Amino acid sequence: MNKELVLVVDFGGQYNQLIARRVRENRVYCEIVPYTTSIEDIKEKAPKGIIFTGGPNSVYGENAPRVQKELFDLGIPVLGICYGDQLMAHSLEGEVTSPEKREYGKTDVNLDNSSLLFKDMKEKDQCWMSHTDYISKVPKGFKIIATTDECPCAAMENAEKKLYGVQFHPEVEHTLFGKKMLKNFLFNVCNLKGDWTMSSFAEQQIKAIKEKVGNKKVICALSGGVDSSVAAVIVHKAIGKQLTCIFVDHGLLRKDEGDQVEKIFKDQFDMNLIRVNAQDRFLGKLKGVSDPERKRKIIGEEFIRVFEEEAKKLGDISFLVQGTIYPDIVESGTNTSATIKSHHNVGGLPEDMEFKLIEPLRELFKDEVRAVGEELGIPHKLVWRQPFPGPGLAIRVLGEVTEEKLAITREADAIFREEIAKAGLEEKIWQYFACLPNIQSVGVMGDERTYCHTIALRAVTSSDAMTSDWARIPYEVLDKVSRRIVNEVKEVNRIVYDVTSKPPATIEWE
């Protein structure tokens, strides 16, 4: 696709995805690549700008990440952040020092607003620092353009070569001028147009899919979630009835979800849809299994088996559509980030699979997927449907999965979702659900002692699922949810609310 590109070079920093999000907020496409990416690969990608992320290392560390010095002579603007700033100075023969005192948290910074980087900004503002080492001598051709009381070089520039470095983190909210500074880098330094929109993305994807597929047949694994739904519609717009969607109902869906999926895609979108009722098969495979990773793998493998069986019945199929999105790729592990969970879309595909993959959304964060869905005319309610994991309720029922536990979780979850909708909070909360933590506790109902299940409610705010905070749901809403669940769902006598952010917790419990 012909689009302007910024590369975010990953040095292992905790804010890498946030940097990418900040760039994309300016309608500029960017990709995160490992620091080991070769000069040849960078030249081939032809980025209009490069951003070095922060990272946990010191430039003097034995195994500290490095880049080839030639990168700074490519004529491509570079912005180094924190470790990226220090690495730029070190690579170009400046000096980096380790002081006795580190600088961490909100800090007042003095800015030279004659620099393009700080154009139209105040001379003094607030930034967020998180570093031990700092630049004590800038490289030849550079000048200092920002200072703090503790850091003699809070930012530097070589305006002629368009090389910039900042010791602080412009991507976080605590740097009050950070978004404006990144905008200056993108538009005043890199001279980008900012013309990457979701409508142009959809048009380009539809055109590319048409060219790739030709007159061949395509199948799509449809779950009814936002990602697979948008992926299916974008491919259907490209090739129409050449696409057949297979909906594997594994019996691990939310209340009435299977029927809703069938109705929307068969009736409303007029797609070729095959629904496979495989509940007994999946529950049989999960019998006696309580380890969450084993559950994920079993469901992923069985899903593929069922899917392949159905695909064979269709005859000559060349392509498989998947709703993989960018966080799936990032969280499933790169050179600089550990695997957090086995993602249902990324892991578990058999090596001998005969289909070629079509992943139209693999470049997008979740909020961008929703925007594409709106552009494609998908109903608002479906586009804003709750994120739902591939393994379904199997990872919201902690421990062994049984029909009884699924029924309890399904009913409690339906009540929670219903009350959130009644309170008008559906689109204010990123994700909300009930789970069964495999805990029983003593209670009293009427005059009798009970020993029943506990339901945990989880609700988070986020924009892309990379980080999240627990949602501050009004007490009166939580009270109503709690009273309804203990009165309407058998075998439940206690409700708890999860008040943990991500990190340290993940959004799902398993």
From Swiss-Prot:
Q: By its UniProt entry, which Pfam families does this protein fall under? A: GATase, GMP_synt_C, NAD_synthase
List the molecular function annotations (GO) for this entry: ATP binding; GMP synthase activity
Protein name, UniProt field: GMP synthase [glutamine-hydrolyzing]
Record-annotated Glutamine amidotransferase type-1 domain positions: 5-195
Entry's EC annotation: 6.3.5.2
Its job:
Catalyzes the synthesis of GMP from XMP.
NCBIfam families linked: guaA_Cterm (TIGR00884), guaA_Nterm (TIGR00888), PRK00074.1 (NF000848)
The family database entries (Gene3D superfamilies) matched by this protein are listed as: 3.30.300.10, 3.40.50.880, HUPs
Q: Which organism is it from?
A: Clostridium botulinum (strain 657 / Type Ba4)
